[in-house]
């Protein structure tokens, strides 16, 4: 965390958070996550990629709790973080553990494979399959999965697969990587 680009970006984020009336960048990001949740709760659609898919839920489940390492906000992580996480606030995931070590390239145990322990697969093994949906009964997932192919190749990256045990029961799954637990 000593690279000049990192220090510059950190200063920019802190300046913007203060300008918008927040005491810290984590507070600002949690407020934005709540705005996004409200948008979705009111019928809006959300398409998220990469770390956005799980970082929303981490932010929402830790509203009012210091879950950010001191390197990010200058204050210590709440010592009772694990017991204070409120999964009822999250959109799609539950019962996950948050990874707070800033030296580990991972946020939680939601995604599979974990970003800090990537399983490198060749081009033929790097794919996921979309499920079929009825346009009559399921118009939204039908629209979102219309790619004219049933298998999407070469799409794996940070947070593109999820541990099924961490997905809330009401979440509609539109595709799968059969190697995911």
Task: Label each region the model flagged.
Residues 30, 54, 84-181:
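Catalytic beta-strand/loop cores that center a nucleophilic Ser/Cys/Thr
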Residues 38-41, 60-66:
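Short, surface-exposed basic-aromatic patches at helix termini and helix-loop junctions that form
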Residues 64-76, 83, 88:
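Rossmann-like dinucleotide-binding core of oxidoreductases
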Residues 49-52, 58-61, 70-71:
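Short, solvent-exposed loop/turn and secondary-structure capping segments
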Residues 63-64, 73, 110, 115:
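General N-terminal targeting signals
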Residues 2-14, 77-85, 100-107:
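Short, surface-exposed, charge-dense and proline/glycine-enriched linear segments
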Residues 37, 53, 57, 74-78, ...:
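Carbohydrate-binding surfaces of carbohydrate-active enzymes
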Residues 1-55:
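Short alpha-beta junction capping motif
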